[in-house]
Regions:
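N-terminal alpha-helical interaction blocks
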Residues: 260-262
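Active-site proximal loops enriched in glycine and acidic residues that flank catalytic Cys/His/Asp
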Residues: 310, 396, 508-510, 540, ...
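PLP-dependent enzyme catalytic core of the Aspartate aminotransferase-like
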Residues: 2-255, 268-276, 290, 301, ...
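A generic structural signal for well-ordered coil/turn residues at beta-strand boundaries
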Residues: 502, 532, 561-564, 591
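A common structural junction motif
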Residues: 452, 553-564, 612-623
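Structural motif of enzymes handling amino- and sulfur-group chemistry
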Residues: 209-222, 236, 445-548, 552-553, ...
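Short cationic amphipathic helices and targeting signals
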Residues: 432, 533-539, 593-596
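Conserved PLP-enzyme active-site core in the AAT-like
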Residues: 266-501, 507, 623-625
Length: 625
């Protein structure tokens, strides 16, 4: 169990965390101020959500690269592979303000190597792929960074900063840099820096101390075991580990059972028994897994529009809209939308047969959706996909595979490991799982094996492996806590005293599209076991109640979800501030408060929400006085 935590404006969430995923925005006004660029808020931001706020270590490294390689008036973005950098260049070209004169973009490869190999963690060079462009095109590059989640991680940046000097001069080009057993081929614009470590800046010094402590006291694998950590992650996600108990690792020469050759493997618990670790692919973020699922479909299937089924996380929809031919949006995600989808498919392909091109590329849906927690009728969608030949991609982040089994209905399942799989809110990650029983599995698998770049930074994988060891236990606690809180809040949605209700709606799988959710409930869970996940949203009958409730909540407040501590945000404000009316048309109200419940003591949580409701009631009384 964890204690209820709070944090001041602009500070990392969790506190004192160098690579925190969230940032504290503790009041409604703070969130509005952030969206409006209010100086009071912006100047307080020490960090932010990594795809929206570029971590300061990455900013520092980018500034060095701009001085070393850029021309006057140029800025850059940093990536971990040439392929990703080329994707960025293509996006910037395609989205140039003037198609007749596209933004000039150039790529440089910069290889950062240690001067002396003193530990396994120092044995690998880091390839930086620098995308340089005119400064006024930065917003376009930032959109690519945000939508795809394929930029370098903050740990990558810190590791690079420890291996190079912050010097404005160009690095030395070497044909045979020291400490390299094998010199990679040296194409044009490939540069190397190999230097003895300069005096280490404080942030990087703290990073090295943290890495030492994590390894020395058994919480993390040594960095030399990154391959084993990634193997453990793939097995954990595939659901093939018969025993997945990781104790403290004092013997650093011993691989953990989950990632070692001695691991006992069995049939998958994911609802498709023949899934293996080879069907699981790791990505640096959840959004990059979603981007690659869509890109994989574009590579293997006839070019058609996609379908976004339900109201999804904002960047998921942007991917479907901005890459490929576009998408149809069925934003409510209800059975009535499936009726409309059937009509659309008939209109697009009136005489469709199995030999005909599919009328759409993929159908993407979240199970359940964010933030309305609606669950699609997956069996019915699967039947449509089999009839029409399109792919189904399901994002299981919110349901998670402890609670729900969606793989039998999907061709591809994606997830943000950053969320509840990690729980600690200190590392990013994503996964993509192929269904080996899917009709298009062979084509998807062979193409992905050819196209896949392992750009998940080793240190991030190490932290993700450590964090996820108690994943199942955390989920069980979170399930129970969230159900108790939601039952409590819902009791205020219908009045027993003759007064108007305070709570308008509690969006939670137990209460929303319950039948569809239960259809996919994990088979080995007992009927009386809580399994609805930790996320819910709540709306109030008056906007003043939303403001007061949120401001009075004594918990962490900021973006993200799935944390081991309770985390809340005014979701529509931070995700759709520039399109509030559009979101409202899909039922995502301006006053919606989204809450990700943590592992705190249940009674303590209920007390916190009781106080927040009392504040909401007081605000309404004052308004009506």
């Amino acid at each position: 169990m964890t204690a209820i935590m709070t944090q001041t404006l602009g500070q990392p969430v969790p506190p004192f965390t160098a690579h925190a995923i969230s940032v504290s925005l503790p009041t409604w006004r703070d969130n509005v101020g952030y969206e409006e660029g209010e100086k009071r808020v912006v100047n307080s931001m020490v960090t932010g959500y990594p795809r929206f706020f570029i971590h300061k270590s990455i900013q520092k490294l980018a500034s060095i690269c701009e001085r070393k390689f850029g021309s006057q008036g140029e800025r850059c973005m940093l990536f971990s592979s040439k392929k990703t950098a080329e994707f960025c260049r293509e996006f910037m070209t395609n989205h140039s303000p003037n198609p007749q004169s596209p933004v000039p973009v150039r790529l440089i490869e910069f290889v950062v190597c240690p001067d002396e190999i003193t530990a396994p963690s120092d044995s690998r060079c880091i390839d930086l792929h620098i995308v340089l462009f005119p400064a006024d095109a930065f917003p376009i590059a930032k959109k690519f960074w945000q939508h795809t989640g394929m930029g370098i991680s903050s740990r990558t940046a810190v590791r690079c900063l420890t291996r190079m000097s912050d010097s404005p001069t160009s690095p030395t080009k070497r044909d045979h840099p020291p400490a390299l057993n094998r010199l990679p081929s040296k194409p044009q614009n490939r540069h190397y820096v190999v230097k003895s470590p300069p005096p280490i800046p404080r942030e990087e010094e703290v990073e090295d101390v943290n890495s030492y402590l994590e390894e020395r006291y058994g919480r993390n694998l040594p960095l030399g075991y990154a391959a084993a950590a990634k193997r453990a992650l793939r097995r954990r996600i595939a659901g093939v580990l018969v025993h997945d108990q990781c104790n403290n690792i004092q013997d650093t020469q011993r691989l953990p059972e989950a990632g070692g050759d001695e691991a006992v493997l069995g049939p998958s618990s994911r609802g498709v028994e023949n899934v293996t670790e080879d069907d699981v692919f790791l990505y640096p973020t959840g959004m990059s897994a979603i981007w690659w699922a869509h890109h994989l479909a574009l590579l293997t299937r006839p070019q058609q529009k996609s379908v976004c089924f339900g109201f999804p996380y904002t960047d998921s929809l942007k991917i479907l809209e901005k890459w490929g031919p576009g998408c149809y949006h069925f934003g409510h995600g209800l059975d009535s939308d499936i009726d409309a989808l059937e009509k659309l498919l008939e209109e697009l392909s009136p005489n469709h047969s199995l030999s005909s091109p599919p009328p759409i590329l993929i159908l993407f849906t979240e199970f359940p959706s964010n933030p309305l927690l609606r669950s699609a009728n997956l069996p019915r969608l699967r039947a449509l996909a089999d009839k029409s030949g399109f792919l189904i991609v399901v994002d299981e982040t919110i349901g998670n595979f402890v609670n729900v089994s969606v793989l039998p209905y999907a061709d591809i399942v994606v997830s943000s490991l950053t969320k509840v799989f990690s729980g600690d809110s200190n590392v990013m990650g994503g996964s993509l799982v192929l269904n080996p029983n899917g009709r298009h599995y062979a084509a998807l698998k062979s193409t992905l094996q050819k196209e896949f770049d392992d750009i998940y930074f080793d240190e991030d994988a190490i932290f993700m492996e450590r964090n996820s060891r108690n994943f199942r236990r955390r989920v069980q606690t979170i399930n129970e806590n969230a159900e108790a809180v939601c039952d409590f809040l819902r009791s205020f949605s219908s009045s027993t005293t003759g007064e108007p209700p305070l709570v308008k709606e509690v969006y939670y799988p137990k209460f929303i599209t319950r039948e569809n959710y239960d259809t996919c409930r994990t088979a080995d869970l007992a009927p009386n076991v809580s399994a609805f996940g930790g996320l819910f949203s709540v709306t109030f009958t008056q906007l003043a109640a939303s403001h007061a409730f949120f401001d009075a909540l004594e918990c962490m407040k900021g973006p993200s979800l799935g944390t081991s501590f309770t985390l809340a945000c005014p979701y529509t404000i931070i995700a759709h501030y520039g399109e509030l009316d559009w979101a409202g048309n899909w039922g995502v109200e301006k006053g919606l408060v989204r809450v990700s419940v943590g592992t705190e003591e249940k009674d303590e949580l209920l007390s916190v929400f009781k106080k927040a409701l009392e504040a909401a009631e007081a605000a309404v009384r004052t308004l009506n006085a």
